[in-house]
Amino acid sequence: MSVPTVLQKILARKAEEVAERRARVNLAEVERLARSADAPRGFANALLERAKRKEPAVIAEIKKASPSKGVLREHFVPAEIARSYEAGGAACLSVLTDVDFFQGADAYLKEARAACALPVVRKDFMIDPYQIVEARAIGADCILLIVSALDDVLMAELAATAKSVGLDVLVEVHDGTELERALKTLDTPLVGINNRNLHTFEVSLETTLDLLPEIPRDRLVVTESGILNRADVELMEVSEVYAFLVGEAFMRADDPGLELKRLFFQERGGVVLGADPD
């Protein structure tokens, strides 16, 4: 397994961070907090229901910064962004909680989830079951597993931990080898295809289109990175890909939710889906 250099650096720091967190709050206490957290909102179901109707199932990302682009949004208020996304028609939220490389925080996830009725995925680099239980404790409804960061044994262990605490799993792949490993190891219905090459950082929507034929029909494909305009959306939809994870394009907009609505819904007669809280 060839792990990109940037990812190696992130994972090394993540191992230190998990050890620090465990020293501050032991697993038993995190498990207690997880048991008392609000019930999960059904992340996978929210996406599947939209996709079955052939409607855009958008996971809208709340991300302050990235290692390659620096700060994406100076005026960064997670609750405000979450409400904007909900009004714009998002199906789910993705919130970055990695501190050192993405300027994220657990508090951002809590604030975003409290401000809306949408399910939330904790976007972080998961390498330890402790983080999975912690995700449930801070209110996440789903966790992300990045295949390029994990071996098959650990990937299966993390997915089993997620299931045990009621979390959905979004597995992320970048190429055919990772896809094969994910399908062999996990039974999650959510398969994310990241169109960004982690070695070169180049983005190509062809990555999703190339891998599509290898994915069983009972899995929902989520295309990640590189969706910038209506033509990109239509390219995916004509290939029957209806689930999208979009972050940077929204974060750079004055009104993230309005940009979401413009990109995915405006040419459909302005119908906004899921804008009314349950």
Curated annotation (Swiss-Prot):
Species this protein is from: Pseudomonas aeruginosa (strain UCBPP-PA14)
InterPro entries in the record: Aldolase_TIM (IPR013785), Indole-3-glycerol_P_synth (IPR045186), Indole-3-glycerol_P_synth_dom (IPR013798), Indole-3-GlycerolPSynthase_CS (IPR001468), RibuloseP-bd_barrel (IPR011060)
Reactions catalysed: 1-(2-carboxyphenylamino)-1-deoxy-D-ribulose 5-phosphate + H(+) = (1S,2R)-1-C-(indol-3-yl)glycerol 3-phosphate + CO2 + H2O
Pathway membership: Amino-acid biosynthesis; L-tryptophan biosynthesis; L-tryptophan from chorismate: step 4/5
GO biological process: L-tryptophan biosynthetic process
Protein encoded by which gene: trpC
The protein's name in its UniProt record: Indole-3-glycerol phosphate synthase
A GO MF label: indole-3-glycerol-phosphate synthase activity
UniProt xrefs under PROSITE patterns: IGPS (PS00614)
EC annotation from Swiss-Prot or TrEMBL: 4.1.1.48
A Pfam family that the UniProt record links to this protein: IGPS
UniProt family annotation: Belongs to the TrpC family.
Top-level taxon of origin: Bacteria
